[in-house]
Each structure stands twice: as structure tokens, then as C-alpha cells.
Regions:
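Basic DNA-binding region of bZIP-type proteins
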Residues: 163-179
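Short linker/helix segments within small regulatory modules
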Residues: 150-157
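Residues immediately within or flanking Cys/His clusters that coordinate Zn2+
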Residues: 136-141, 157, 162, 168
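Short helix-coil boundary/hinge micro-motifs
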Residues: 1-138, 142-149
Length: 179
């Protein structure tokens, strides 16, 4: 994998609210071009700071990096399920429910890297509960799997970008039919 500092395209496919944190975290790997943002604990720390999931004093280890890669893969598989591709994965995290007179909020029990990962799982849970999760999809193109937010009225988008992945998939199918 080629290490890169960020993958800053497809900003038009942003997810609403905190679900965007999940999309940005999951899109730290560009499968098609072999670009990896999370290539070191320092890069993971930078991302988690940018996303506001950890404080400045939090230390990030190689084990945290390995868990980040696993979490990212699981999030992508769950998002593939939103695009009609069967998957058999699950997320697990320790979260606390904070309730006041106006709201109930899931929060991580810890303020470390594990807490940051739990926060992402909590965002997924909340999105599943409010119905927005089904719109966060992973691109169907087998070498992409980029997460995008489906804003189509009938929730029918299957590719992160029709002009790229949709076109390439349709062209390949056309050529296969033509022999």
C-alpha cells in the first residue's frame, strides 16, 4: 500500500451529522489505487484528532492501528449490506447512555482510542435507529467499496460516483456481452 496523508475526494457524498465521521474513517483506504491513510499510529492519531474523537494527550499504539484497520473493514462490510451485498459481520463496543431532560446520547465509556472506536460504533447504532444508516453505502464496484451517502429519492444509488465506478462497471459489462 502506498502511504498518503489524506484522500480528499468525493466530498459531495458527505453523510449528515456525525455519520460523516464514520464515512471519513471508513474511507481511509483507497482499494483501487492502493492508497492507505492509516499507515502508522501517528497517522491514526492525526485522523482521530481531526475527527474530534480523541484529545491531544491520547497515545496511539500499533495495536490500536491494527484494531482501526479491523474496524474500518467491518464498517465497509456493513455498508456493503446497505447496497444489497450479503455480509456476516458485527460491531461491539462499550458505551454509556447519558440521559437528561431533553435527550439520550450514547457516549464512549473511555476517552482513549478504544473510546474513539466505541464512539464510531455508537454513531452507527444511532444511525440505524434513526434510519439514516441505510443510506450510507459502500460502492458496489469490487475494487472500490468507497463509502458514500445515498441522497437519491428512492435510495437506489449503488456506486460512489456514476461518472467513475458506474461508467467503468457498465463499460466492462457491455464489453463482456460483445465478446
Amino acid at each position: 500500500m502506498e502511504p498518503v496523508d489524506s484522500i480528499d475526494y468525493l466530498l459531495d457524498a458527505e453523510a449528515p451529522g456525525r455519520l460523516e465521521l464514520v464515512r471519513r474513517f471508513a474511507n481511509t483506504l483507497d482499494e483501487e489505487h492502493g492508497r492507505e491513510v492509516l499507515h502508522s499510529p501517528a497517522q491514526l492519531r492525526t485522523l482521530l484528532l481531526e475527527l474530534g474523537l480523541i484529545g491531544r494527550g491520547v497515545r496511539v499504539t500499533g495495536d490500536d492501528l491494527a484494531r482501526a484497520h479491523e474496524l474500518r473493514d467491518t464498517l465497509r462490510h456493513l455498508a456493503l449490506a446497505n447496497n444489497g451485498i450479503a455480509t456476516d459481520v458485527a460491531l461491539e463496543a462499550t458505551l454509556t447512555v447519558r440521559v437528561d431532560d431533553r435527550d439520550a446520547v450514547l457516549e464512549p465509556s473511555e476517552r482513549d482510542v478504544a473510546g474513539a472506536f466505541a464512539d464510531l460504533v455508537g454513531i452507527v447504532y444511532t444511525a440505524m435507529a434513526d434510519g439514516s444508516w441505510t443510506r450510507l453505502k459502500a460502492c458496489r464496484r469490487d475494487v472500490c467499496h468507497w463509502l458514500f451517502y445515498d441522497r437519491s429519492r428512492n435510495r437506489s444509488a449503488v456506486w460512489c460516483q456514476m461518472s467513475v465506478c458506474g461508467n467503468r462497471t457498465k463499460t466492462r459489462a457491455y464489453r463482456a456481452r460483445r465478446g
